[in-house]
Amino acid sequence: MRPIGPIAFCALALCLAGCQTTSTHQFATPAPTWATKSGQLSYQGPKISLIGEVLVRYSKAGELELAFSKGPGVNLLLLRQDAQFASAEGPLAHGRWAGASASAPERLRGWFGLREQILAGRNSIQTNAGGERFNLRF
């Protein structure tokens, strides 16, 4: 009789590999032609409220990179997004997520919703999404 341990281990490894949250999508690298804005972001979520610094870079083609931090060296969230794909990492993302924007987890949808308003060139953004409030000023 064969031991079931190695077979169970292989089956588990294959299942977990299918749960991966990394993406093979390559986001554009920020270039000198990208617009850069810095300011403050007030975030109020269901369990936490934070005010921190935000750095946003975006291209005319719609690629976006947003970094939200609470002082030097305390990165809370790094977002990358284009028209179809998005990625988020950091404590506010509960780790790391990447994939199609349309399939983003509920906890990230409000963050990814900021893209359109930032690309519109607004210097002040106030929005509510899914129990979260964002107040962004450049």
Language-model regions: role of each:
Residues L16-W34:
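Bacterial Sec signal peptide processing site at the extreme N-terminus
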Residues I4-I7, E106, T127-G130:
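Generic low-complexity segments that are intrinsically disordered, proline-rich and/or Lys/Arg-biased
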Residues W34-L76, N123-F134:
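Post-signal-peptide N-terminal segment of Sec-exported extracytoplasmic proteins
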Residues E63-E116:
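An acidic-aromatic
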Residues M1-T21:
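Sec-dependent bacterial lipoprotein signal peptides
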Residues K47-S49, S87-G95, R115-F138:
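Non-transmembrane domains of secretory- and envelope-associated proteins
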Residues A8-C10, G113, N135:
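Compositionally biased, low-structure terminal segments
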